[in-house]
C-alpha cells in the first residue's frame, strides 16, 4: 500500500490485491473515492474479490452483512465467523459491478445494475430475482422503490425514472393516483438535443428526492 495514498493500492500487483482486482476505488459523477471500511474476510471462499458490503438488521432482529462479489453473494453473521451462500439461481456475471442495496419495508433488495434486481424475503434461502424493470440506480424514498436509468422491453431509457407503490416494491403499475409511476427527463418527441440527459444516481433530503 502506498504511504502517499493511504487506502489506495498503487504499488502492488493486482493479483496480490484480493478484494479488488487492481480497482479498490469507485467512480461516481464528479469524484473518485476509495472503498473505506472494506477489509479482507479470510473466510470468503477461494479469496473471491469483494465489491461491496451491506450491513442491516433483519425482521428477526439479527444483524447480517451481505457480501457482494462478481459472481457470488454471501450472507455473514454479525461476528463474521460464519457465512451462507445466497447467490441467486442465475448467478451475477458482471465483473467490477457497482452494487447497490436498499431496504423497503424490511425487505432487502440489491442489484449490480446489470444482471437483475434481487430480493431476499427468506433468510434461509437464496436471493430471488424480482419481476420489475432493470435499472442501474435505485433508491428508497418514502417506502417506495425508485429506479433510474431503466431498461424495459429490451429498450434502454437512460433518462427514465420509475417508482413503485408505497411498501410494495414489486408493484409499478402506473395509475392516476400517482402511487406508482414513471417520468422521463427527455421528450420522446423532442429534437434530440436532450439525449445527453442521463440519470447518474439519487439523493434524499427530508421527503424529497433529487435525481
Where do the language-model regions lie?
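Recognizes the extracellular SEMA beta-propeller fold with strongest preference
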Residues: 1-211
Amino acid at each position: 500500500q502506498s504511504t502517499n495514498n493511504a487506502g489506495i493500492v498503487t504499488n502492488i500487483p493486482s493479483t496480490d490485491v484480493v478484494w479488488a482486482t487492481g480497482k479498490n476505488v469507485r467512480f461516481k459523477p464528479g469524484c473518485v473515492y476509495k472503498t473505506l471500511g472494506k477489509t479482507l474476510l479470510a473466510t470468503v471462499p477461494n479469496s473471491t474479490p469483494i465489491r461491496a458490503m451491506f450491513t442491516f438488521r433483519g425482521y428477526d432482529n439479527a444483524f447480517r452483512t451481505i457480501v457482494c462479489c462478481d459472481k457470488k453473494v454471501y450472507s455473514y453473521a454479525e461476528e463474521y465467523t460464519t457465512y451462507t451462500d445466497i447467490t441467486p439461481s442465475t448467478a451475477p456475471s458482471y465483473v467490477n459491478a457497482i452494487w447497490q442495496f436498499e431496504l423497503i419495508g424490511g425487505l432487502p433488495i440489491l442489484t449490480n445494475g446489470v444482471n437483475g434486481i434481487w430480493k431476499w424475503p427468506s433468510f434461509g434461502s437464496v436471493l430471488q430475482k424480482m419481476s420489475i424493470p432493470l435499472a442501474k440506480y435505485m433508491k428508497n424514498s418514502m417506502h417506495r422503490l425508485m429506479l433510474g436509468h431503466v431498461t424495459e422491453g429490451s429498450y434502454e431509457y437512460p433518462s427514465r425514472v420509475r417508482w413503485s407503490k408505497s411498501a410494495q416494491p414489486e408493484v409499478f403499475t402506473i395509475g392516476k393516483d400517482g402511487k406508482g409511476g414513471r417520468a422521463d427527463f427527455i421528450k420522446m418527441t423532442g429534437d434530440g438535443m436532450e439525449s445527453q440527459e442521463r440519470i447518474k444516481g439519487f439523493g434524499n433530503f427530508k421527503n424529497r428526492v433529487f435525481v
